[in-house]
Amino acid sequence: MSTAEMRAKLERAREAQARRFTAGDRMDCNARIPERRFRELCAMEAPAEALFLAALRSLKVSARARGHIVRLARTIADLEGSDRIAERHVAEAVGYRGRDSR
């Protein structure tokens, strides 16, 4: 992927985030999504949610790390142009988090 292609992909992801947040939100990117809004703003497909819950059990991550995984999966989905978080997005996010998330 060229630099120009990557830049365009990132710009589309940022545009998706801008559309997601309303004027009254105190958020401008996925990193600022509060946990109470996860269900609304970070909708997961059923297989993605199953993988997420299985990963939480097996990795025994902290509550804070759980939030990081959800936000990261949302960002990965945005980079792909996906409205919902898919299983592959969760798998990638969990892979980035690794075992250092305890």
How would you label these PLM feature ranges?
Residues 1-102:
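Basic, amphipathic alpha-helical bundle interface domains used for macromolecular binding and assembly
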